[in-house]
């Protein structure tokens, strides 16, 4: 597999990464055996970046990855972990805690669950409004000095926060949503990353399956699937958004590829400093996503894609209002497109 560097300070990884969240949380039940087989298939295909969060399934996701990596060469993978999200026993969200003591405590439990002596990239999942980013990054920097963490990462923060964080310790990458229908980072965040030499790991490249080509208006989200409440999947927005998908389907059909492959290839084409995370829970979906790596989009293709899905064309924001308000990356932005 072709490789990309996560910024000037980060590791070299396969050009796409595997996001494991859906194997444990937010999308309804997943088949454990198939999830593990998918992780193995990703490794066999040369995918090295494995992304998780300690709050995905309240530790379940880390334990799942540990099981998948049992007997494997630890050096074959780059493990990215988000932390700081507080969960209740009813799976509710209770806020964020990235105080230095909490940062080190969360890591201790993560190392135990994953059965490893280090995490390659450690990042707060969200900005803690009660803790200066300098204190949070300073704590991770201490963990880097101790050998427990190799690189500092960030998630869903704005340009100013990135600058402040990077002044404390070099930041490898920013994990943030980026797709054909979520392009807000192009205004200020992406240029700032490039100025600072910070890479991008892009999640939501298929907008939670909305622009995968596999979603339909008739499809019903399973119990525990957060798309039940996602604005872009709502009754008032789904028709408009699926019309965009159909426009992409026509383009994909003309090239003999799938909608998902076009959407992922578009993200890949936005710069070699961007590594898309694909949230495949099954081997067939992973195989489809990998097909984007060999899809070359011509200038005419890009122009056609822009006409089919112009920036801001999607109906609805990427999260509900309360979640959007909590995103440092969205502060000061007029729109969420």
What are these regions (language model features)?
Residues 1, 195, 219, 223-254, ...:
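Terminal-tail/helix-coil boundary detector
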Residues 1-77, 336-337:
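N-terminal binding-site loop/beta-alpha segment at the start of enzyme catalytic domains
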Residues 6, 18, 35, 50, ...:
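Conserved, mostly hydrophobic/aromatic
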Residues 8-27, 80-94, 118, 123:
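N-terminal small/glycine-rich loop or linker at the start of catalytic domains
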Residues 21-23, 53-55, 82-86, 124-127, ...:
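Active-site beta-loop-alpha junctions enriched in small/polar residues
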Residues 44, 90-184, 188:
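Glycine/proline-rich, positively charged
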Residues 166-173, 194-201, 272-274:
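Glycine-enriched alpha-helix->loop->beta-strand junction motifs that scaffold or abut catalytic
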């Amino acid at each position: 597999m072709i490789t990309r560097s996560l910024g000037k300070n980060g590791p070299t990884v396969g050009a796409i990464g595997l996001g494991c969240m859906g194997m444990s949380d937010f999308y309804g039940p997943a088949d454990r055996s198939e999830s593990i087989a998918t992780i193995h298939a990703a490794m066999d295909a040369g995918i090295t970046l494995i992304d998780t969060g300690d709050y995905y399934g309240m530790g379940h996701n880390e334990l799942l990855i540990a099981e998948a990596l049992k007997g494997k060469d630890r050096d074959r993978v780059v493990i990215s972990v988000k932390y700081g999200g507080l969960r209740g026993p009813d799976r509710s969200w209770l806020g964020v805690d990235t105080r230095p003591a909490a940062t080190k405590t969360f890591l201790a439990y993560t190392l135990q669950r994953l059965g490893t002596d280090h995490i390659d990239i450690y990042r707060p999942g969200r900005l803690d409004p009660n803790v200066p980013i300098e204190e949070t990054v300073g704590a991770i920097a201490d963990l880097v000095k101790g050998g427990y963490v190799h690189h500092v990462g960030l998630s869903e923060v704005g340009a100013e926060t990135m600058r402040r964080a990077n002044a404390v310790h070099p930041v490898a990458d920013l994990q943030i949503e980026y797709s054909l229908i979520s392009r807000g980072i192009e205004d200020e965040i992406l240029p700032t990353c490039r100025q600072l030499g910070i890479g991008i790991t892009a999640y939501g490249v298929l907008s939670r399956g909305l622009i995968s080509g596999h979603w339909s208006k008739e499809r019903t989200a399973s119990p525990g699937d957060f798309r039940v409440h996602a604005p872009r999947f709502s009754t008032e927005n789904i028709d408009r958004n699926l019309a965009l998908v159909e426009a992409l389907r026509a383009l994909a059909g003309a090239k003999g590829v799938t909608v998902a492959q076009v959407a992922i290839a578009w993200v890949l084409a936005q710069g070699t400093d961007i590594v898309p995370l694909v949230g495949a829970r099954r081997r067939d979906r992973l195989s489809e996503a990998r097909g984007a790596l060999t899809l070359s989009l011509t200038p005419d293709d890009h122009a056609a894609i822009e006409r089919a899905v112009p920036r801001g064309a999607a109906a609805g924001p990427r999260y509900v209002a309360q979640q959007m308000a909590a995103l440092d990356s969205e502060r000061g932005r007029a729109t969420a497109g």
